Amino acid sequence: MTELSGFQQEIARLFFSLQSSQGFVLAGGGALLASGLSIRPTQDLDFFGSPGQVSVSLALDQFLDAIQQQNWDYELLSHANDFARVRIVGSAELIVDLAIDVAPRFPIAQTPIGPVFSPLELAGRKLLALFDRAEARDFVDVYVLSKKFGNQKVFDAATQIEVSLNKQVLARMMNTLERFSDDELPIDHSEVGTLRKYFANWAKDLDGA
């Protein structure tokens, strides 16, 4: 099974060693890997905190100091009150996002590298990512997670995070899968056909609901 790279694990542990990291959790593809829910490699790490509970600016300042102490190079790509993006170059290269996001709806899970969203919350948030942007990796992640938890549980988890999730709009987003070629979907080619049928059927069910 694919895991976080050694450098990614090092970065995550460094971040969670900071006092200002309290209240942040690992999210996204990195959390899926850390939780053993995905084999799709990721090129970035996302750390999310709840509104009013964390400070992106304070965490960023401490994080950049810690990066410098490791003698790694970095470039601050973006910085606002609720979001920051840093490119870090050490033994490898990595993009790290610090962001304010919706508070967790499920108990936080603990992994050897630090706190992450619970598996079902990760699944719900991935479905919301598909709803918002529908990138190739979102289809693959939702496919894998929905096979594990079931469509209804994943949808219900997503609605606990975002109550306004609309079934018909979600169906339309699922139908945009056709804009990606088979080679653009980060999954074994033997599963691409099944994945396409899976979303076609799910979109049909949602559209008729």
Predicted features along the sequence, with ranges:
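Compositionally biased terminal segments of proteins
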Residues: 1-209
